[in-house]
UniProtKB/Swiss-Prot annotation:
Keyword vocabulary terms for this entry: Glycoprotein, Membrane, Signal, Transmembrane, Transmembrane helix
Extracellular topological domain: 21-564
UniProt-annotated location(s): Membrane
InterPro entries given in the database record: Telomere_Capping_Maintenance
Signal peptide: 1-20
Superkingdom: Eukaryota
Family: Belongs to the MTC6 family.
Entry-linked PANTHER family: MAINTENANCE OF TELOMERE CAPPING PROTEIN 6, MAINTENANCE OF TELOMOERE CAPPING
Protein name as catalogued: Maintenance of telomere capping protein 6
Function: May be involved in telomere capping.
UniProt membrane topology term: Single-pass type I membrane protein
Species per Swiss-Prot/TrEMBL record: Lodderomyces elongisporus (strain ATCC 11503 / CBS 2605 / JCM 1781 / NBRC 1676 / NRRL YB-4239)
Length: 616
């Protein structure tokens, strides 16, 4: 029997080793604070996440993820994002590999837009990062730092620093963040310019100096497609869009899809792109300043199949002055539903960029995102005061008042809380049962529900009675607020809103602007309840009322259940088999003879000592 126990122990260890090996080599780490991918596939991990591991997630990460989740039904051309122009990095670091570390950090901070300027070198016919050509009569090492001059401007450029380095850095970020919990949709915006010269007798010397040689292709690619090709597994291409538009015409549509089907240009929802098409990035030429000449770059069919241009995808890029005027129109209280519908249906991919003459401010950025614009930070430095930085950064370094932050990475981090169209800066509050840790023994208190305030969404006590927002089921910019009715979040049911409306929340910035407009027109009082809470799981904000389930809860599918019980089932079968073998081999001849012998001895003993009656 002792041997049987030892065998059972060894079999148990073996089963654990065999069946746990696969789970230990999972493609994705479910620790949401440091999730990385170990695969080169662009497929997003479909495994569910244990949300309890993210209880201490930074406020910013929760806000980013929540804004993404509520925007899932929205077409990608309407989803608000924020990002940086690499010019702001190169202005400080030079066109060198040193800028890659800063790009990596900016991506990890949540940059969802990267604006990249590419230069078509008419001397060598390649796309390059450096705004000036390299003289070919000088021998360079790949890591040579060279001061090159063109059009009376001098630039610090590293000879071997190419577009491939930028694409590889973005690819590594996309790969490492390719999980259900951390996946976001990015925009790679291209600004095309020429290194141009007018061919004449006077430029013969220039042609000799900058003529291509055997190392020309080291510093760039000959086509736009080749330039972005390292990102191809993740790119949402014009071909993918065309396929979607063809299939959408014959599919059953949700209320949101029916509304946006009225648009002059239909795009798939964020949810479809990320989780059905499994794409992470679109590449869009937002500005084409190529000089028309005999040596100008000719866009190829392969370029058009993988990259969007203005004639294949409409977009708008405004400067700060134009953006201010745009926001004045959008946030005008005289607007009606039709105004907001036109913005949602007939304007697409709305960006605003700044420059060193007029930089973004926190207040300005906040206004831009509220009126439906996506800010792209393009200046080389920003003014950030000590107070505002201290409220938004975990770093030990604080700038003095009005100090210029030459490190754009630090400035962007300080601006992050102002980049959300949804949550107010510093929201959502987490790990609090009550505000100020005040708990009354005779009253229910639960800061788990979200309400609208003048500066965005805030977490409020679910038991407090506020006015609440009702949205038209078929028209997402049509809102109703009853100024005579106040309810706690828990008491807002299906009968709380008029027919054709339900208790809901804004899912993009234009809907939010329309709701602000109604609140002002109806003289409603803030806060106003919207349908969003983290009642079920802390930091997992969901819509659908107080009983809505977090999509990231750890669930057990049939397949997973079989995998879970398989080891114990096999161990049980092995044990039964061993018991059967033991019983089988116990019946040997020696044991049989022994039994017969003792049976005979006992029979003879009873025969000799047979007694009558009951012994006294």
């Amino acid at each position: 029997m002792f041997n049987l126990i030892k065998i059972f122990f060894l079999v148990s260890l073996l089963s654990k080793w065999v069946f746990c090996d696969e789970s230990n080599n999972s493609n994705y780490n479910t620790n949401t604070s440091n999730t990385t991918s170990n695969t080169t596939s662009s497929s997003i991990s479909a495994s569910t996440i244990n949300i309890t591991e993210s209880i201490n997630t930074d406020v910013i990460n929760v806000a980013v993820r929540t804004q993404r989740d509520v925007s899932k039904p929205i077409p990608i051309d309407q989803v608000g994002v924020a990002g940086i122009s690499l010019n702001s990095v190169f202005d400080n670091q030079g066109y060198t590999a040193d800028s890659l570390a800063e790009l990596t950090n900016l991506l990890q901070l949540g940059t969802q837009v990267v604006l990249l300027t590419l230069y078509w070198n008419e001397f060598t016919s390649v796309w390059q990062l450096c705004p000036a050509p390299f003289p070919q009569n000088v021998t360079y090492y790949l890591n040579s730092l060279v001061n090159v001059t063109w059009n009376n401007n001098t630039y610090l450029c590293e000879y071997g620093f190419t577009t491939n380095d930028i694409m590889d850095t973005i690819f590594e970020y996309l790969q490492s963040s390719n999980t259900v919990f951390n996946v976001y949709f990015m925009h790679l915006l291209l600004n095309l310019k020429s290194i141009h010269y007018e061919k004449s007798n006077k430029t013969i010397d220039l042609e000799n100096i900058y003529a291509p040689n055997s190392r020309t292709n080291i510093i760039g690619n000959t086509t736009l497609y080749d330039t972005v090709a390292p990102l191809s597994p993740y790119i949402f291409t014009p071909d993918v869009l065309e396929s979607y538009q063809n299939s959408e015409a014959n599919s059953t549509q949700s209320n949101y899809q029916q509304f946006y089907a009225q648009s002059n240009y239909t795009f798939p929802s964020l949810d479809s792109v990320l989780f059905l098409e499994v794409k992470r990035l679109l590449v869009n030429v937002v500005n084409n300043d190529l000089v028309d000449s005999r040596r100008v770059y000719s866009i190829t069919l392969r370029d058009r199949s993988n990259i969007f241009f203005n004639n294949t995808m409409p977009s708008t890029t405004l400067d700060t002055a134009e953006a201010d005027a745009f926001c004045d129109r959008v946030l005008n209280s005289a607007n009606d539903i039709e105004t907001f519908n036109n913005l949602s249906l007939y304007t697409h991919f709305r960006y605003v960029t700044d420059n060193n003459k007029k930089r973004f401010t926190m207040k300005g950025v906040r206004r831009y995102v509220k009126c439906g614009l996506s800010p792209v930070f393009n200046a080389s430095s920003y003014q950030v005061t000590n107070d505002s930085f201290a409220q938004t950064s975990n770093q030990s370094y604080y700038p003095t008042a009005n100090e210029s932050l030459l490190d754009v990475e630090v400035a962007f981090e300080a601006f992050i809380p102002y980049n959300f169209w949804s949550f107010a800066p510093g929201q959502p509050i987490m790990n609090e049962t009550t505000r100020g840790n005040v708990l009354s023994s005779d009253a229910n208190v639960a800061y788990k529900c979200v309400a609208m305030n003048p500066d965005g969404w805030t977490v409020e006590d679910c038991y407090t009675e506020y006015q609440y927002a009702c949205k038209n089921i078929t028209s997402p910019n049509d809102w109703f607020i009853s100024t005579r009715s106040r309810r706690s979040y828990f008491d807002i049911d299906n009968d709380a809103c008029p027919d054709g409306y339900n208790f809901s929340l804004p899912r993009l910035s234009i809907e939010m602007a329309a709701l602000y407009n109604v609140i002002k027109k109806e003289n409603a009082e803030y806060p106003v309840w919207i349908d969003l809470n983290d009642i079920t799981i802390s930091t997992c904000f969901v819509s659908g009322g107080p009983y809505a389930q977090c999509p990231y809860q750890k669930t057990v599918t049939t397949k997973k259940f079989i995998r879970m019980i398989a080891p114990s089932s096999i161990v049980a079968l092995v044990i039964l088999f061993l018991i059967f073998l033991e019983n089988l081999f116990r019946k040997n001849q020696l044991q049989t003879n022994r039994k017969k012998y003792w049976k005979k001895v006992l029979s003879e003993h009873y025969a000799k000592h047979e007694q009558e009656g009951v012994p006294s």
